[in-house]
């Protein structure tokens, strides 16, 4: 926040910037800031939305039709889109913009640079009209129209998927449903509830202290320009810092005019070398005091709850160890349990501990990740490095590029071409509040891995299978100890390059350019039958052997050692499904299947109970009690027993019901001419003979059902035939792999009908 507010700054904050302020306002952010206490109009407007003020509720509305694909920007200043986003829209003045000679201007003729900071963040994709994009990682940020914006519609913006991954913003959010069936989005760290998905994403990134996002959200120089930073590195907050950090130096703007390609190349090389010199000091320096750097001490005590699905790769070099954090995949607010476990096992950077070595050899990490200490323990060589890196950057965004300790050789070229290859698509997750899970018998978990099929790779292995880097010209090269590949593996350079993931592409390269990285991620990606960039069948077999060795290095005991179930693990469907499968297997072994399941799997159902025990069970899992339902509708009705939601009512007595079958049976009690069954032991009236038999068995054990049930009608078919009756409204709804005593819908159904 500026020290004092000038009239121009106040006008910009209210969205009524003077018309004379912008003869060349498109480039007002290009001039150096001579007086930090009185910023320009456009910088004040951007600071209003992203960093300093909550009072302004000015919105930007379209006064005419805005075509799809129109670009606005670049966005100047510190970019913190969504920092003050909430579910509620505060009313306020509206700034109308219209197209004039192909350019979007406001009522006073001001260019987008004056009011682009007033565009509010979108709460959900339905109301979003613009998306924030960047052409290159670290490039300038623009707004692009997603569709044709109609007159009177508000302009709202949110991150594109590639930009969200770069800024550590979750890209997906799975809704849950409250007792009224309305969608809600819950933060499983602090238990806050939101109505819109983007509100949850912004909360996780900027405000949730338990998830680690709140401590890095209020930094005055985050993503700010620094002297000597390259144009590529300024927009997304990856500028090289001086060797001696100075957090009190005023932020100065730099020229962003297009430069010659040669000048950009030399400047990028200098920026990369500056980052490298800073990284080389990280393992040697001690942790600075919290008062100087502002790093909260509780950051060391936070549990391993990493939302980012990234993999820490440590490369040993000739001159010393250096960390190479690598961020594959999409950062989701609700991560599948399989990926969470894989990231926790292969992610030494998220754990704290005292470093005992310069670095972990990449070959050992690829071979099983056991030589450098178990991740999560104090033996991890990367623990100290990550702690210092976390404090050194003052909780900035995790840098997507970090070079190793040694500078490149003098003869190392710096080509300017930017190349990449797209990552292979992974297994899609169902966007549903009730996840579909599949459980197999215990024997299926120990089957051998095929040697030539990538599609059959096990999910719970070390995500790295094989890493082959393109040989760099100049400098000494060395090969890593292969995991069964012999001489088929490409050599690794002595100076490890930088890594980055942007827009679905995995990039690496020397200090001046990125190159494609050939990397296979076991369990995270689904491979096709053949991969063209593997060097022949021998290399494919070597990669499969390395994957099998990595999977075999993790024993069943380690895979089964899960933490105690808390609020976060309650959303991990794989862990809960394992618990439910264990209960189901125990019931199968003890022969205590419910009658409905026994009848369905009997001679009339196409198989006996023994054959059902060897078949994998698929279904929908209840996250409250662990029951497994064969159909989603059955789980939906069952969930009402936990939430107490009863949307159905009897039209005669207005009694509420949550299960339609219970309501149908209750209505039959009011029907004339349909005399129900009556229990001769307690006088309870029931609708069907099946209900009477179940009632006698559960409430009057040891008693036998009489042939004549009260004043009921003639005898009905035996109990064993009724589960297959097409008129049945109970068992045909769904099959639950539980016993009657633990099922409130089955065992306690008699009480519901009273």
Swiss-Prot record:
GO terms for molecular function: chromatin binding; DNA binding; histone methyltransferase activity; RNA polymerase II-specific DNA-binding transcription factor binding; zinc ion binding. GO terms for cellular component: nucleus. Pfam families: PRDM2_PR, zf-C2H2. GO terms for biological process: GABAergic neuron differentiation; hypothalamus cell differentiation; methylation; negative regulation of transcription by RNA polymerase II; neurogenesis. Its EC number is 2.1.1.-. Coiled coil: none annotated. InterPro entries: PRDM13_PR/SET, SET_dom, SET_dom_sf, Zinc_finger, Znf_C2H2_sf, Znf_C2H2_type. It is found in: Nucleus. The keyword NAD does not apply. SUPFAM superfamilies: beta-beta-alpha zinc fingers, SET domain. Residues 383-400 have a biased composition (Basic residues). Residues 279-304, 345-404, 694-754 are annotated as: Disordered. It comes from the Eukaryota. Belongs to the class V-like SAM-binding methyltransferase superfamily. This is PR domain zinc finger protein 13.
């Amino acid at each position: 926040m500026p020290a004092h507010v000038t009239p121009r700054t106040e006008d910009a904050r209210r969205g009524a910037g003077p018309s004379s302020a912008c003869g060349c306002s498109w480039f007002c952010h290009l001039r150096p800031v001579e007086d930090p206490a009185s910023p320009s109009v456009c910088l004040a407007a951007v600071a209003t939305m992203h960093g300093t003020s909550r009072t302004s509720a000015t919105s930007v509305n379209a006064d005419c039709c805005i075509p799809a694909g129109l670009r606005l920007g670049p966005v100047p200043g510190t970019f913190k889109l969504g920092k003050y986003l909430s579910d509620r829209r505060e009313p306020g003045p509206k700034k109308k913009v219209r197209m004039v000679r192909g350019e979007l201007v406001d009522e006073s003729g001001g260019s987008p640079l004056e009011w682009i900071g007033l565009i509010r963040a979108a709460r959900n994709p339905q109301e979003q009209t613009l998306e924030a994009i960047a052409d290159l990682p670290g490039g300038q940020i623009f707004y692009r129209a997603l569709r044709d914006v109609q007159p009177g519609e508000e302009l709202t913006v949110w991150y594109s998927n590639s930009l969200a991954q770069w800024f550590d913003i979750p890209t997906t959010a799975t809704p849950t449903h409250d007792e009224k069936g309305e969608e809600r989005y819950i933060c499983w760290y602090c238990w806050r509830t939101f109505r819109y998905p983007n509100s949850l994403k912004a909360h996780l990134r900027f405000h949730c202290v338990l998830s680690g996002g709140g401590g890095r959200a209020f930094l005055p120089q985050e993503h700010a320009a620094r002297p000597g930073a390259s144009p590529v590195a300024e927009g997304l907050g990856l500028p090289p810092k001086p060797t001696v950090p100075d957090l009190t130096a005023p932020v100065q703007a730099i020229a962003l005019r297009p430069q010659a390609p040669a000048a950009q190349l030399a400047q990028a090389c200098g920026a990369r070398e500056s980052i490298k010199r800073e990284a080389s000091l990280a393992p040697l320096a001690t942790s600075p005091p919290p008062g100087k750097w502002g790093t909260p001490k509780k950051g060391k005590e936070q549990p391993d709850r990493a939302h980012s699905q990234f993999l820490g790769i440590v490369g040993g070099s000739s001159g010393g160890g250096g960390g190479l954090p690598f961020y594959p995949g999409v950062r989701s607010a609700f991560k599948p349990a399989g990926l969470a476990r894989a990231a926790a096992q292969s992610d030494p950077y998220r754990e704290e501990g005292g470093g005992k070595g310069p670095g972990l050899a990449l070959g050992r990490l690829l071979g099983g990740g056991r030589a450098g200490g178990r991740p999560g323990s104090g033996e991890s060589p990367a623990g100290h490095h990550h702690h210092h890196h976390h404090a050194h950057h003052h909780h900035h965004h995790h840098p997507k590029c970090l070079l190793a300790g040694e500078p490149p050789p003098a003869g190392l070229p710096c080509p300017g071409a930017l190349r990449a290859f797209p990552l292979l698509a992974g297994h899609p997750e169902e966007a549903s509040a009730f996840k579909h899970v599949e459980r197999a018998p215990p024997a299926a978990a120990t089957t051998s891995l095929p040697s030539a099929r990538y599609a059959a790779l096990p999910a719970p292995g070390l995500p790295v299978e094989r890493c082959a880097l393109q040989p760099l010209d100049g400098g000494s090269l060395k090969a890593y100890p292969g995991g069964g590949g012999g001489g088929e593996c490409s050599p690794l350079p002595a100076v490890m390059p930088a890594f980055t993931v942007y827009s679905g592409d995995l990039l690496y390269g020397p200090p001046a350019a990125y190159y494609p990285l050939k990397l296979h991620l076991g369990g995270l990606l689904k491979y096709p039958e053949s991969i063209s960039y593997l060097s022949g069948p021998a290399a494919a077999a070597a990669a499969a052997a390395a994957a099998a060795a990595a999977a075999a290095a993790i024993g069943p005991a380690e895979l089964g050692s899960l933490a105690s179930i808390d609020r976060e693990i309650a959303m991990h469907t794989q862990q809960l499904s394992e618990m439910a499968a264990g209960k189901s297997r125990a019931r199968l072994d003890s022969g205590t299947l419910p009658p409905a399941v026994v009848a369905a799997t009997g001679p009339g159902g196409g198989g006996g109970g023994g054959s059902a025990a060897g078949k994998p069970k698929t279904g929908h899992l209840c996250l409250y009690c662990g029951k497994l339902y064969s159909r989603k509708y059955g789980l939906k009705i069952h969930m009402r027993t936990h939430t107490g939601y009863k949307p159905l009512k009897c039209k005669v007595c207005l009694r509420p019901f949550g299960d339609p079958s219970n309501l149908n049976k209750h209505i039959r009690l009011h029907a004339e001419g349909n005399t129900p069954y009556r229990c001769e032991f307690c006088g309870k009236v029931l609708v069907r003979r099946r209900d009477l038999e179940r009632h006698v068995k559960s409430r009057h054990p040891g008693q036998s059902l009489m042939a004549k049930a009260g004043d009921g009608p003639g005898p009905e078919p035996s109990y064993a035939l009724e589960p297959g009756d097409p008129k049945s409204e109970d068992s045909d709804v769904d099959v639950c792999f539980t016993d009657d005593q633990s099922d409130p819908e089955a065992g306690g159904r008699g009480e519901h009908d009273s």
